[in-house]
Amino acid sequence: DPGCLPDWSSYKGHCYKVFKKVGTWEDAEKFCVENSGHLASIDSKEEADFVTKLASQTLTKFVYDAWIGLRDESKTQQCSPQWTDGSSVVYENVDEPTKCFGLDVHTEYRTWTDLPCGEKNPFICKSRLPH
């Protein structure tokens, strides 16, 4: 595509690539930054359709979700920090709070799903079109 590196795809001034190597959300973001981009942000239905198509074409026969650049930055759990009986939370047994988002393999990458950030998945990088 004009302006993008070989095997990257262009859409409205940005370049995209789906990487099959798997990593945690942090690993994936770091890798994208090293390749002059970030994990993909998705700002419209049209862009979502473009990224979905790219992911489903690249990740055929894959059983993984695919990381995008969305993460819940809040440090607290999404739900209110209190038991239903009113007692406060003094003990937690949570593997890892679910705070990172990926495209869901079960819907052929059409919908977003929240996942533990430490899960290892392929990912989609997005960078600005070099001028």
Swiss-Prot record:
GO terms for cellular component: extracellular region. PROSITE patterns: C_TYPE_LECTIN_2. Disulfide bonds join C4-C15, C32-C125, C100-C117. Pfam families: Lectin_C. It is found in: Secreted. The keyword Disulfide bond applies. Keywords: Disulfide bond, Hemostasis impairing toxin, Platelet aggregation activating toxin, Secreted, Toxin. Belongs to the snaclec family. Heterodimer of subunits alpha and beta; disulfide-linked. This is Snaclec bitiscetin subunit alpha. It comes from Bitis arietans. The lineage of its organism: Eukaryota, Metazoa, Chordata, Craniata, Vertebrata.
